[in-house]
Design a protein with these regions (language model features):
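Bacterial N-terminal signal peptides
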Residues: 9-18
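Sec/Tat signal peptide C-region and signal peptidase I cleavage site
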Residues: 21-23
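Short active-site loop at a secondary-structure junction
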Residues: 41-49, 70-123, 130-148, 173-184, ...
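Loop/turn elements at helix/coil->beta-strand transitions in domains of secreted/extracellular proteins
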Residues: 45-48, 55, 147-148, 220-221, ...
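Short, surface-exposed beta-strand/loop micro-motifs that present aromatic residues
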Residues: 333-334, 342-351
Length: 354
């Protein structure tokens, strides 16, 4: 068995942008193969899966390398951890609720709840799923948080409450004023969807909502929670010491990143997303609309100071569940996802639906 090396060892790559190939042409299979093998050598990746979408249609899907320490092959039907690509799926799901009049992007979440947020919990439904909202009792700024702020990483929360030194939930800046990556914001919006006013059409299970979308798109091996049918062909990972890391069987749907999927399934979702399937034109446009300027140098570490205005990228904004930008090929959006053993980039171009 080959020696295992680096962090990026299973790259779950959705590349409608086509690896820096010329804008006027799509890469052929041999050209993609050559680029993938170069990238795998450079990153020491043991496995990689790739999809290309053009004009809103899946034009190429393939997989390379191995999926586990037993050298089993990675295939286009291998289940992989989608990580934060879940956030884009959740944003797409929320926009269905917006179209149905159940959620308003710019109305505070407080208006969707039957009682003040800090009065919820502790409760058996909370462990390992939602945040400790009682911690916000002395900070009234929770009342300002809207669904758009949750989807644009501008709630003021840390990425997750449990990485705070005191493991409590805090608001670090006035909501809506800065971009600072936060899975906790997505979890809050999930809470509002699942425990909001039933008279408003909320009180909905996010796992059920996403499963309905996956079923409509023919994504048979994708879900926000683990099911036994995924065991037969699943990808593990490797840490930065080259040690195999078993796939985590996530039991609770979490909008911030619990999705398991395959490259074939995720290609179907990405194609539907760039086409705007199932959404009104206005809601599809909201996803990739510049909602909040990103003024820091990097996404991590969190809570960075703003760059001087002259050094800020003028085109870089948070969209809903994505980051939007303008480049040589026009307006586009991006989402990445990773943990200590996998990495997943998705890059899409609006004009060519690529």
């Amino acid at each position: 068995m080959p020696r295992l090396h680096k962090y990026l060892l299973i790259a779950f790559s959705l590349l409608p942008l086509s690896f820096q190939f010329p804008a006027q042409s799509l890469p052929t299979g041999p050209a993609i193969d050559a680029k993938v093998h170069t990238l795998m050598l450079r990153t020491h990746a043991n496995g990689m899966a790739v999809a290309v979408i053009d004009q809103g249609k899946v034009t190429y899907v393939d997989s390379y390398g191995i999926r586990d320490a037993e050298n089993d092959p990675l295939t286009t039907e291998t289940v992989m951890y989608g990580a934060s690509l879940t956030k884009t799926v959740f944003a797409y799901t929320v926009m269905h609720l917006v179209d149905q009049g159940k959620i308003k992007l710019d109305t505070p979440i407080a208006a969707d709840l039957d009682k003040p947020l800090p009065t919820y919990g502790p409760d058996p439904i909370f462990p390992d799923k939602y945040g400790p909202y009682k911690d916000l009792a002395d900070d009234p700024r929770w009342k300002q948080i809207t669904p758009r702020m949750c989807l644009t990483h501008s709630t003021g929360f840390n990425n997750f409450f449990f990485i705070e030194p005191d493991q409590k939930l805090h608001i670090h800046f006035d909501p809506g004023t800065h971009f600072s990556y936060s899975g906790e914001g997505f979890i809050l919006l999930q809470f509002a969807v699942e425990h909001g006013r039933k008279a408003q059409g909320l009180g909905l299970d996010v796992g059920d909502l996403t499963n309905a979308i996956f079923s409509r798109l023919g994504m048979a091996r994708t879900s926000l929670t683990w099911h036994n049918g995924q065991h037969a062909n699943v990808a593990d990972g490797w840490n930065d010491q080259g040690q195999p890391q078993p796939h985590s069987d996530r039991k609770k749907p979490r909008a911030a990143g619990s999705m398991n999927t395959t490259i074939s399934d995720m290609a179907k979702f990405t194609a539907a997303l760039v086409r705007g399937d199932g959404l009104t034109p206005a809601s599809r446009a909201e996803i990739s609309k510049p909602s909040l300027h990103i003024t820091t140098r990097n996404q991590f570490p969190l809570f960075q100071p703003d760059l001087p205005a002259s050094e800020q990228r003028k085109d870089l904004y948070a969209g809903l569940g994505v980051v939007v930008f303008d480049g040589p090929q026009g307006h586009g959006f991006y989402k990445g996802g990773h943990d200590g053993q996998t990495a997943n980039p998705m890059v899409c171009l609006e004009k060519s639906q690529r």
